[in-house]
Amino acid sequence: MVHWTAEEKAAITSVWQKVNVEHDGHDALGRLLIVYPWTQRYFSNFGNLSNSAAVAGNAKVQAHGKKVLSAVGNAISHIDSVKSSLQQLSKIHATELFVDPENFKRFGGVLVIVLGAKLGTAFTPKVQAAWEKFIAVLVDGLSQGYN
């Protein structure tokens, strides 16, 4: 079990209150698909992802980005039991979708960039440290279904 300080919890939840899951989810997933183009193989049914403009205008990327950030929000709402809250989602990604768990780390890194860009100077090093810790816990939880 992870120990969270009150300051870390406050940093994570205060940032999360500023997140627009639809917009920021689209931004984060779109960035993942552009920066790491090989991740597009998991989204072959999304249609045209051939360039930045196509990804930015893709409604399926927007919808799935919202879904992903909604799952992040659910994990935040279970911050004291993140790993157990992600058991089913981990199992799906491992046994049905066959997602390489390294991509969870990549998405986490992209999400931190999106949050930093959104918040500017309010995304202080202490806030970033709390988010980096949360992302590590999130990745660990999502990776638990892999043997």
From Swiss-Prot:
Chain sites annotated for binding heme b: 64, 93
Similarity comment: Belongs to the globin family.
InterPro entries: Globin (IPR000971), Globin-like_sf (IPR009050), Globin/Proto (IPR012292), Hemoglobin_b (IPR002337), Hemoglobin_oxygen_transport (IPR050056)
Listed PANTHER family: HEMOGLOBIN FAMILY MEMBER (PTHR11442), HEMOGLOBIN SUBUNIT BETA-2 (PTHR11442:SF98)
Protein name (Swiss-Prot/TrEMBL): Hemoglobin subunit beta-2
Complex and partners: Heterotetramer of two alpha chains and two beta chains.
One GO CC term on file: haptoglobin-hemoglobin complex
Molecular function terms, GO-annotated: haptoglobin binding; heme binding; metal ion binding; organic acid binding; oxygen binding; oxygen carrier activity; peroxidase activity
PROSITE patterns from the UniProt entry: GLOBIN
Annotated source species: Xenopus laevis (African clawed frog)
Domain Globin as annotated: residue spans: 3-147
Tissue expression: Red blood cells.
Pfam families: Globin
Protein function: Involved in oxygen transport from the lung to the various peripheral tissues.
